[in-house]
UniProtKB/Swiss-Prot annotation:
Protein name: Lipid-A-disaccharide synthase
A biological process from GO: lipid A biosynthetic process
Pfam families given in the database record: LpxB
One Gene Ontology cellular component: membrane
Protein species of origin: Geobacter metallireducens (strain ATCC 53774 / DSM 7210 / GS-15)
Gene for this chain: lpxB
Domain of life from the UniProt record: Bacteria
Its biological purpose: Condensation of UDP-2,3-diacylglucosamine and 2,3-diacylglucosamine-1-phosphate to form lipid A disaccharide, a precursor of lipid A, a phosphorylated glycolipid that anchors the lipopolysaccharide to the outer membrane of the cell.
Family annotation (NCBIfam families): lpxB (TIGR00215)
EC number: 2.4.1.182
UniProt KW keywords: Glycosyltransferase, Lipid A biosynthesis, Lipid biosynthesis, Lipid metabolism, Transferase
HAMAP family, sorted: LpxB (MF_00392)
Reactions this protein catalyses: a lipid X + a UDP-2-N,3-O-bis[(3R)-3-hydroxyacyl]-alpha-D-glucosamine = a lipid A disaccharide + UDP + H(+)
Entry GO MF terms: lipid-A-disaccharide synthase activity; phospholipid binding
Length: 384
């Protein structure tokens, strides 16, 4: 009697944060069962974990309606590639990570092919387009959600769901002490440090980095000796930011890989919205969140969004723990003013840190990737 063939798993992560979470899941799944093989859409982290990437996720990381339309050709080609792979040689399981509009199209193909679907990191259906939960109920076999408030939402819709904790709770930790990090980055411990976090997508760099740098110039003028540091996302290259830095005339320390060490040396951070706000919250660093998209995207979204906040750390908290500067509010003057308040007002800063500590409590304990890997093995019919 021959041995059963190795199980094949397609995994789809369309942007930098999904690439990171997907890589940790794959590592844990392979630790539990080294015979599994993974292929799909991912970036450098997933490739390093052993995933055969048929499409690079950096090509697909765009935000907003207008931006998606501009990249339609690339996104459609990626969809066609996955559709062909699923229909010609169906995998034993499809794992989808966030990236909802694209991933739901892939889920539909998988459903027709009889492939089981695990959705890890829920689309934000609780925030906007809540009707999508009906489609999820039809196309997805299991949800692995990372926020506790998502569980009753899916249970009400009849979708099998498990709260697995948040993957960031496992990994948000500096690799050295603050004093060691300051020395490693060449920063003066006696001077203030402000983090500039312009995002992981080229579109964000083009749209938001200039105003962040303008705010930094204002801060430089108001706080002599202030220092700036920027963590460069793995999805970007020096060439993506160099022209902006050169035009600004600012001295900015650019760091790769050590993002949590970067965070811990900062007195305050100016950041784009997204997963990074949770990482900063877990590190307990005061921040100001900046969010701008095209006017059309914003007007459409304003009519659809059902939550009171843009920043996911504020959504988790259920209150505005840190300021959000949206669209026309996101000026260099406003950004500099909010950062300046952290630098000048210790009571305000401590109140913010206490709010961020509450966010950490709500994100659960570690072990997220192991719990999701257990679900993967269960759906593949394997014993742990």
């Amino acid at each position: 009697m021959g041995t059963a063939p190795n199980k094949r798993v397609m995994i789809v992560a369309g942007e930098a944060s999904g690439d990171l979470h997907g890589s940790n899941l794959v590592k844990e799944a392979l630790r539990l069962d080294p015979t599994l093989s993974f292929f799909g859409i991912g970036g450098p982290h997933m490739r390093a974990a052993g995933v055969e990437t048929v499409v690079d996720s950096s090509e697909m990381a765009v935000v907003g309606l207008v931006e998606v339309l501009a990249h339609f050709g690339v996104i459609y080609k990626a969809y066609a590639t996955l559709k062909r792979l699923i229909t010609t040689n169906p995998p034993d399981l499809l794992i989808l990570i966030d990236y909802p509009d694209f991933n739901m199209l892939v889920a539909k193909v998988a459903k027709r092919a009889g492939v089981k679907v695990l959705y890890y990191i829920s689309p934000q259906v609780w925030a906007w387009r809540t009707g999508r939960v009906k489609k999820i109920a039809r196309l997805v076999d299991r949800m692995a959600v990372v926020f506790p408030f998502e569980v009753p939402f899916y249970e009400k819709a009849g979708v099998p769901v498990s709260f697995v904790g948040h993957p960031l709770a496992d990994r948000v930790s500096p690799s050295m002490s603050r004093s060691e990090a300051l020395a490693a980055f060449g920063l003066d411990p006696s001077r203030r440090v402000v983090g500039l976090f312009p995002g992981s997508r080229r579109g964000e760099i083009a749209r938001l980095f200039p105003v962040i740098l303008e705010s930094a110039k204002l801060l430089r003028d108001r706080y002599p000796g202030i220092q700036f540091i920027l963590p460069l996302a793995s999805s970007l290259t020096d060439a993506d930011i160099a022209p902006h830095l050169a035009a600004s005339g600012l001295e900015v320390v650019v760091a790769r890989d050590k993002v949590y060490d970067v965070m811990q040396v900062c007195d305050a951070i100016a950041t784009v919205s997204g997963t990074v706000t949770l990482e900063i919250a877990l590190m307990g660093v005061p921040m100001v969140i900046i969010y701008t998209v095209s006017p059309l995207t914003y007007e459409v979204g304003k009519r659809l969004i059902r939550v009171d906040h843009i920043g996911i750390c504020n959504i988790v908290a259920g209150e505005r723990v840190v300021p959000e500067l949206i669209q026309d509010e996101a000026t260099a003057e406003r950004i500099a003013a909010e950062i300046g308040r952290y630098l000048d007002d210790p009571v305000h800063t401590e109140k913010t840190r206490a709010g961020l500590a509450r966010v950490r409590e709500k994100l659960g304990s570690g072990g997220c990737s192991e719990r999701v890997a257990g679900i993967v093995l269960e759906m593949l019919g394997k014993k742990r």
